[in-house]
Structure formats: structure tokens, C-alpha cells
Amino acid sequence: MKTFSAKGNEVKRDWFVVDASEKVLGRLATEIARRLRGKHKAEYTPHVDTGDYIIVTNAEKVVVTGRKFKNKMYHHHTGFPGGIKSASFEKLQDKNPTKIIELAVKGMLPKNPLGREMYRKLKVYAGSEHPHTAQQPKQLEIEE
């Protein structure tokens, strides 16, 4: 019996919608990353993108445990000398709530071209509305 290896053009990709309301950020992000990679499928192949499309709604209502709401910091560099910028979870959630989930999931995906391809299948929206109704996404429940 030969080992099965999935081919990129033969993989069936489904669309799922996840409601992030009152979900813990890390637990939500790990399940999303797992689904984007395709590890939940029997035909998972490490060097092929076998994952599904994930739509995350209500990103503004995601929660963190402990004191991370005030103390967790996000950093980025502008590219100019002395250009390190920092923002707390609280400020980033007010300014750009989708960025929090995007950064959490992106850090859990491979850091290579295949990981970037997987990341493109993630769609995050701050509110409960999304423009992907034509894809008929299924509701995905993520337990706490």
C-alpha cells in the first residue's frame, strides 16, 4: 500500500464562518490555524495546502484572560531609525480589532510561502456581517 499524498488542485476546500464573540483569543486562533492548515482532514499532507476557508465575525468581541487586556503589547517597526511602535491589546482592539486575530493566527502558521498561501484563506470582520454569503459558509462551533 502506497502512502497517500494530496494534490493541491484535487483538494476540496469548504467555507466556514466562526463567531468570535466571548471566545478566548489563543484557543480560537489555534483552532482556526489548524483548520487553515487542513490538519483536521484525513488527506492532510504537510507540503500541500489542504485547508479550508475561514471567515471570522465579531472580532471586536474576542477576549483574553488575566491582565492581558491592559498589559499585552503589540509591536511593529516602521523601517525608519527609532521607528518602533507599540500598542496595548486594549488600544488595538479599539483601533483595529481584526488585526488582533490576524496576528494571532499568522504566528501559528508556517513562516514560508505555503504559510502565506494558507493565511490568505482567512477573512476577519469586526462586526457580524460579511460579504461571503455567495460561498454558503457553514457555521463552525469552537468549544471553550
From Swiss-Prot:
Record keywords, A-Z: Ribonucleoprotein, Ribosomal protein
Annotated Gene Ontology cellular component terms: cytosolic large ribosomal subunit
One GO biological process term: negative regulation of translation
Pfam family, one: Ribosomal_L13
Organism, scientific name: Legionella pneumophila (strain Corby)
HAMAP family per UniProt: Ribosomal_uL13
Protein name: Large ribosomal subunit protein uL13
Subunit structure: Part of the 50S ribosomal subunit.
Record-linked SUPFAM superfamilies: Ribosomal protein L13
UniProt similarity note: Belongs to the universal ribosomal protein uL13 family.
Its job: This protein is one of the early assembly proteins of the 50S ribosomal subunit, although it is not seen to bind rRNA by itself. It is important during the early stages of 50S assembly.
Domain of life: Bacteria
Gene: rplM
GO molecular function: mRNA binding; structural constituent of ribosome
